[in-house]
Amino acid sequence: MSILDNIEPPLIEKEYGALHPINQTKKYLLQLLSKIGFEEVHGPEIETEEFNFDMLNIKKTHPARQMHDTFYAENKEYVLRTHTSPVQIRSMLESQPPIAFTSAGKVYRKDDDATHLPMFHQVEGIYVDKNVTFANLKDLIHQILHDLFGSDVEIRFRPSYFPFTEPSAEVDILSENGKWLEILGCGIVNPVVLENCHIDPNKYSGLAFGLGVERIAMLKYGVNDIREFYKSNMDFLSQFK
C-alpha cells in the first residue's frame, strides 16, 4: 500500500454565481408587471431622433436634446436612447388598443455622480384603452410601490411636467429617516403622442410610468452610492446572492 493511498484531496468549497442586484431588481419589476397584465416588448438601444424625441412630443428646443445631455452619433440623426419609451412607440404603431406594454433595458444620459450614471436601466409601462383616468394611474402606482416597499409605505404625488404626458406627476415615498425620496415619474399619455401612433385620442386615453432600476435597488437594499453596483467588488456583490 502506498502512502499516497491515505491522502484525501482537500475539500474545495464551490462558489456559485448569482444574478447581479440590478438584474434581480429588473427581473422582479418585470414579473410584477407581467402579473398585472403588461406584455414586455423590446427595441434598439441606438435610436433615431424621430423615435427618441419627435414621436414623444419632445420639441427641437427641449433641453434634453442638447449635446450636453444626450449621446449623439456622428451624423446626429441617431442617439443612444435616453429612455425606453421609443420601444413602446414602435410597439404601439403595430398594435391597436387595448394595449399594455412594458419595456426594460439600458438607457444613456450624460450624468455621472453618486446618484446618476451615464448608463443606467429603466423599466417603463404604458396602458391605453377607453376611459383610462388619473385615478387608474394612482391605483396602479400604489399597487407597484406597495409590492416593492410594503403596504404601509407612505406615497405622495407631486405635479410635474413631461412632454409625453399631460397631466404629469413625480412620485415620492417617505424614507425611514423622514425624508421624501423621488421614486418614479408618470402621467396620462399626451394626446399628441397617441395621434403620432395613429390612435384616436377622442376615443382612447392612456397612462404611462417609468422607474429607474438602480434607484429602486438603492432604496430597497440601502445603497447610498449608485456606482457601487458597477465596481466589480465581490464583497459587495456577494451580499445579494
Predicted regions and their residues:
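TRNA-recognition modules of translation machinery and tRNA-sensing kinases, especially anticodon-binding
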Residues: M1-K241
